[in-house]
Amino acid sequence: MFMGEYHHTIDDKGRLIIPARFREELGVKFVITKGLDNCLFVYPMQGWAEMEQKLRSLPFTRADARAFVRFFFSGATECELDRQGRILLPGNLREYARLDKEVVVVGVSTRVEIWSRSRWEEYCRETSDQYEALAEKMVDFDI
């Protein structure tokens, strides 16, 4: 399981160190794609296969399902760690997530998210005010 928040920087070549705690579970190869809330989602290969299976079951006759699947898969790329535990983030994904130098790598149960530090701080400020209300809504999901 992925959890925690780690602050890192992207170097001039677009490389990012993946936190040591995440490396073993991610494996040598994994998939990065456009996530929600303008962050990047990172899935281990098994997690990606499970997500792919779920998305394949969506009805292709629905325009919203087609649009989501198209967007999700078009941004996906298979990545590999180098010997220093870094990945090269493709320019299109850095642009999508508005990543510059400072980023936050967040563990979210079955996936890792990569956020621009400023966007993450803004998201946390917005969400912290709603945390209790969100917790109350989780009752509907039997949590």
UniProtKB/Swiss-Prot annotation:
Molecular function via GO: DNA-binding transcription factor activity; transcription cis-regulatory region binding
Pfam family name, one: MraZ
UniProt main location, coarse: cytoplasm
Alphabetized UniProt keyword annotations: Cytoplasm, DNA-binding, Repeat, Transcription, Transcription regulation
Subunit comment: Forms oligomers.
Compartment(s) where it occurs, according to its Swiss-Prot or TrEMBL record: Cytoplasm, Nucleoid
CDD domains per UniProt: MraZ_C, MraZ_N
GO cellular component: cytoplasm; nucleoid
One example of a Gene Ontology biological process annotation: negative regulation of DNA-templated transcription initiation
SUPFAM superfamilies for this protein: AbrB/MazE/MraZ-like
Protein name (record): Transcriptional regulator MraZ
Family, as annotated: Belongs to the MraZ family.
Record domain SpoVT-AbrB: where: 5-47, 76-119
